[in-house]
């Protein structure tokens, strides 16, 4: 049995606290906060804020703190931590405690190790807190310096400390420690940028977006800084400018709000676990099934750990015999890249292939190689990063009411030869399939072992996908399916990762370039038989297929699969609404359990739930995507969706604000312009009356308006005010929706000169009269 607890540590100069929240209790209290399918949904979508707060009071929780002058809770704190040690109950059942935190792997766990190390080795609580504060500063100052963080003797000693509990870091599980990347302008180095707990809470639609803030230093607090040599004798204004909030002394009257802030953070961790429990559970299942430890691993890291285990088994080599190697390349000739069976039938494509064969490149980044080629009416870009067609926005609807045979289920015929469907031909696990079928492998690894491993995993994935059994090879089917998906999908990316064990840029090119050329072979053959391809990307194409052409299509498909040794599924669109390759919504015609259904898939600006699918993504007014979806799929006016909405958080926006900035509200009061400093992470919606919010550079004072200069209302702390009283600027959200709808309806790209055309013809696709008026 595992006792699951969320926790968080806070440290100031004269203050140390830990707050614990029982995950089991939290899940029980909010077990009814699910949708019609039983899937967990944000609390605000089910409960009022008043009800959320009332229920949070019922959750089992424990908070402890100590200060220079109050150590009354120290022994209780230590006792609580020690009781997380694994033990057997009276029935002989092993009881284990897992503590869940956010960035706890690199901070909170180390702080608890320091607490347990020093509490019996210091002469006073003040000395203990000073040690803990110094430890905190060391950890924080080292986190931007990877080498120091890994090699610091003191930090390494804390890492080796045997904690009584098992730590689980949700930040690492969801890859929030590497949520985005910035490129150093001087060195060109790509540096990961983490996403903090407050930013993440916005994606959860958490009701309380609370940053830790203390009132300005007053006279009472200022006296305490005389103990600090470099601050001694400074006046209050100087102290307020120089002392960071985490380097403050906390006065007794500020402890209660501090503990509330701490508790709110822990509740957010608990909410992540509630909303994404399957992802958390998968780490336990994988760890148990494969005897590995992935409790603190993202999917990418999990793939590394599993690949190491699998490859060592397939090759017969111990990890230390093959890890740490890579293959460096200088010049890479496409003559060594392109497979010999790549052939084209038309002169333009033959010339294109000849050009490719003469190419030599020296790197594999996006701009290393790029060529355009036209087949039929579509222009395609072939590049190191993948194939894509140069598409205008489209709205496509299949005719008839019935289906062709589909890999997603069911078999029906369209009505007559002139009926057509738009189909998506999708290559099954394209890159892994190329690797396995055509023996593509890093030169420093055993080719047969590598390719047989990838091929075996791919085939096993197909078996698991179609299995009705609860277990496959003695492993839970869902766990095995996830393992196979994680490892297979990661392999190609690892080939191009310079610091990884699979690095070989020639293997990257053999996979991507041949994949694109094989796709173009298929496109050419279809166009030669008057079957038109409308769009293409790396592993799939969109085709308009008439019933009369189905036999020709199947013959071309079979021949192509035999030549390339690849397989593809054919899925049938009911509709496809696309702004571009990364922003679309579609409905597929499927049959499930004998019932005709439409399966919705959407992405980017057309997916109302994009913010919840990937916590590394930002959060931007999901109501707009919902209005766009309703407009196309339900023929519902945009303004109707906006005005019928009940959740104000669906209208909210946020923007990333770097540490070099702070945020200010600019308002006019009694004819005077005033600037009020806000917390750095703000959640706001565009309103008719409100304030302008700006990013202000801490050093030079430069200002940058947020929300495109619109007036907004900040709503960091949600209340139960009726949405009709929120003074929402519906015109703003309507215009944002039309920025997506207009290009699609007009079939004009919003890039370049298309912007002016869209503005000129905006709304001109709407009929003046309803067709029903004419009988």
Annotate each language-model stretch with its function.
Residues 7-9, 68-70, 101-104, 425, ...:
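Short His-Asn-centered micro-motif
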Residues 43, 185-192, 202-428, 517, ...:
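Conserved "right-hand" nucleotidyltransferase catalytic core of DNA-directed polymerases
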Residues 4-18, 455-505:
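Active-site cores of enzymes that catalyze phosphoryl transfer or operate on phosphate-rich substrates
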Residues 443-483, 555-579:
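Charge-dense polyanion-binding interfaces
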Residues 33-196:
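Conserved DEDDh/DEDDy metal-dependent 3′-5′ exonuclease domain
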Residues 107-118, 428-442:
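Short active-site loop/helix that positions an aromatic residue
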Residues 338, 343, 384, 392-393, ...:
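C-terminal, non-catalytic extensions of nucleic-acid polymerases
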Residues 2-11, 169, 423-425:
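Two-metal-ion RNase H-like nuclease active-site motif
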């Amino acid at each position: 049995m595992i006792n699951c607890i969320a926790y968080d540590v806070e440290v100031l100069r004269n203050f140390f606290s830990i707050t614990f929240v029982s995950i089991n209790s939290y899940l029980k209290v909010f077990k009814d906060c699910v949708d019609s399918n039983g899937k967990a949904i944000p609390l605000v979508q089910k409960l009022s804020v008043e009800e959320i707060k009332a229920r949070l009071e019922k959750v089992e929780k424990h908070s402890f703190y100590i200060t220079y002058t109050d150590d009354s809770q120290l022994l209780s704190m230590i006792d609580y931590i020690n009781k997380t040690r694994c033990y057997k109950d009276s029935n002989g059942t092993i009881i284990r405690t897992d503590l869940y935190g956010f960035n706890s792997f690199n901070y909170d766990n180390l702080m608890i190790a320091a607490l347990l190390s020093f509490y019996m080795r210091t002469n006073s609580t003040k000395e203990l807190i000073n040690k803990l504060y110094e430890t905190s500063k060391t950890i924080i100052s080292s986190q931007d310096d990877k080498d120091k963080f890994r090699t610091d003797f003191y930090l390494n000693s804390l890492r080796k400390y045997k904690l009584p509990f098992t730590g689980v870091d949700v930040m690492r599980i969801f890859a929030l420690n590497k949520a985005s990347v910035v490129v150093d302008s001087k060195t060109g180095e790509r540096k990961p940028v983490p996403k903090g707990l407050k930013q993440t809470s916005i994606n959860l639609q958490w009701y309380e977006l609370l940053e830790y803030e203390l009132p300005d230093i007053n006279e009472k607090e200022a006296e305490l800084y005389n103990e600090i040599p470099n601050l001694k004798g400074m006046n209050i204004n100087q102290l307020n400018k120089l002392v960071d909030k985490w380097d403050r002394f906390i006065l007794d009257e500020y402890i209660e709000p501090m503990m509330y802030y701490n508790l709110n953070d822990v509740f957010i961790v608990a909410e992540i676990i509630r909303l994404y429990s399957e992802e958390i559970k998968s780490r336990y299942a994988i760890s148990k099934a494969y005897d590995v430890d992935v409790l603190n691993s993202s999917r990418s890291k999990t793939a590394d750990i599993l690949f190491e285990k699998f490859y060592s088994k397939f090759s017969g080599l111990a990890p230390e015999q093959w890890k740490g190697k890579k293959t460096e390349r200088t010049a890479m000739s496409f003559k060594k890249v392109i497979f010999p069976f790549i052939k084209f039938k038309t002169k333009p494509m033959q010339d294109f292939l000849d050009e490719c064969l003469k190419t030599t490149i020296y790197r594999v980044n996006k701009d290393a190689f790029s060529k355009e080629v036209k087949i039929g009416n579509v222009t395609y870009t072939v590049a190191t990063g993948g194939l894509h067609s140069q598409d205008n926005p489209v709205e496509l609807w299949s005719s008839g009411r019935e289906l062709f045979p589909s890999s997603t289920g069911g078999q029906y015929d369209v009505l007559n030869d002139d009926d057509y469907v738009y189909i998506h031909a999708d290559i099954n696990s394209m890159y892994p399939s190329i690797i396995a079928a055509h023996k593509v492998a890093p030169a420093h690894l055993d080719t047969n072992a590598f390719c047989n491993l990838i091929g075996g995993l791919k085939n096993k994935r197909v078996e698991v996908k179609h299995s009705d059994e609860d277990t496959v090879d003695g492993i839970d089917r869902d766990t095995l399916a996830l393992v196979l998906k994680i490892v297979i999908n990661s392999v190609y990316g690892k080939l191009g990762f310079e610091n990884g064990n699979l690095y070989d840029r020639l293997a990257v090119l053999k996979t991507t370039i041949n994949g694109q050329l094989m796709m173009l072979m298929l496109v050419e053959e279809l166009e030669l038989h008057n079957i038109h391809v409308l769009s293409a990307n790396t592993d799939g194409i969109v085709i308009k297929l008439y019933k009369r052409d189905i036999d020709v299509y199947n013959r071309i498909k079979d021949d192509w699969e035999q030549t390339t040794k690849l397989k593809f599924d054919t899925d049938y669109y009911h509709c496809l609404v696309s702004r571009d390759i990364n922003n679309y919504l579609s409905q597929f015609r499927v049959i499930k359990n004998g019932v005709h259904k439409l399966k919705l898939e959407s992405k980017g600006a057309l997916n109302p739930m994009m913010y919840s699918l990937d916590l590394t993504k930002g959060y931007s007014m999901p109501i707009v995507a919902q209005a766009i979806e309703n407009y196309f799929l339900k023929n519902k006016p945009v303004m109707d969706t906006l005005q019928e909405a009940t959740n104000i958080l669906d209208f909210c926006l946020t923007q990333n604000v770097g540490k070099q900035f702070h945020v200010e509200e600019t308002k006019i009061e009694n004819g005077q312009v005033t600037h009020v400093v806000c917390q750095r992470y703000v959640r706001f919606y565009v309103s008719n009356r409100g304030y302008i919010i700006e990013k202000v550079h801490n050093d030079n004072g430069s200002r940058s308006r947020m929300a495109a200069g619109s007036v907004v209302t900040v709503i960091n702390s949600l209340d139960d005010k009726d949405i009709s009283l929120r003074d929402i600027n519906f015109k703003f959200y309507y215009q944002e929706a039309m920025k997506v709808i207009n290009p699609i309806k007009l079939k004009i790209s919003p890039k370049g000169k298309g912007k002016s055309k869209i503005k000129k013809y905006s709304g001109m696709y709407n009929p003046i009269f309803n067709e029903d008026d004419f009988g």
